[in-house]
């Protein structure tokens, strides 16, 4: 162990071994470089385990008090930078135990009674991820709130809607942003749902078969905030479903972030120009002084590959493992740690982008929705209201659009006389129906982009976020 109060020494193996590990294999085998991330959880689990051993009469109360005191001292040493595990510790569990024995002597050797590193690491990892879920929930809520704030600002703003990245129908911009609010809500629900399966304690399952030591697994589960225990000891130490399930849920978060990121990149392009990037969230070019680059959404879009890759890696790692514990499981931690870190960073970055990094160019948006044929469907709807069968109306409007393209005019620029040459049912009120605002307002079906419907949804979301005094 290098330079810390924990000292050095060989691994904690039995006398079955006559030789030490080859130095290269020792480096290859060790996980202390990354699983030290689990230190706080390892200490919490060990404290609960020590108290349970005393409650069950396995060790003396005084010994449990000594163990708890020693574990808290390790926590303090870690906070002050004095606790510095090294390669010889192999992992966080041995590092803590070695220091505890150095502090307490023979009493420190009693801590591992009735447990194995197999159930210990499973406990640590679940405790760690549970805490990260709480933090991710706040990131998701913050991102939702940033989307909602923008939606409240633009409840009366229009934006072109697209299918196949071709202009389709005009939308209320708030409606577009609320679509992402809904996506994030599903993300939050998925995280909450997986927590139910995550929050079971494997502690006390020991290596794989349980233990003859008279322990109380439910006591430690309760002390650590778990909802219950694994019913099968073999399953308890073999299960890494929660790492896959979380990474899959995080991958969907990244999908949603990436879809918005792609739209922001498109909206910020000179060809589109729907948003203006601020200096707070954009970068320049080392060669071209006129450039303002959308690095934040581009990085978010790119970082999806990391999260997706970790998900695939976890699936591949687990798929061929026989029960119970296998060293392959060591590979779950760096993947899981990076999924959490990357997803959290991307949520934070996109939240800041929405809050400080962009503004919508409403004049450009208004001009865009007025300069295309995205109101063509409304001509068909108009004719349907005049008792023209929809498919007939659809074919007719296609012919009208073709004519307009050939003549270089918009639908609203045709004269009433020319319209009536296409169909006699058309009257002067068609022109009012074709204005972009009326096109949007007409979408009054529940969940539609009509202003009244959008305001209903804004009111619901504002109430959820305590913003019920918003005026649209």
From Swiss-Prot:
InterPro entries: Arg_succ_lyase_C, Argininosuccinate_lyase, Fumarase/histidase_N, Fumarate_lyase_CS, Fumarate_lyase_fam, Fumarate_lyase_N, L-Aspartase-like. Pathway: Amino-acid biosynthesis; L-arginine biosynthesis; L-arginine from L-ornithine and carbamoyl phosphate: step 3/3. PROSITE patterns: FUMARATE_LYASES. It catalyses: 2-(N(omega)-L-arginino)succinate = fumarate + L-arginine. SUPFAM superfamilies: L-aspartase-like. It comes from the Bacteria. GO terms for cellular component: cytosol. It is an enzyme of class 4 (lyase). GO terms for biological process: arginine biosynthetic process via ornithine; L-arginine biosynthetic process. The keyword Translocase does not apply. Pfam families: ASL_C2, Lyase_1. Its EC number is 4.3.2.1. Belongs to the lyase 1 family. Argininosuccinate lyase subfamily. This is Argininosuccinate lyase. The lineage of its organism: Bacteria, Bacillati, Cyanobacteriota, Cyanophyceae, Synechococcales.
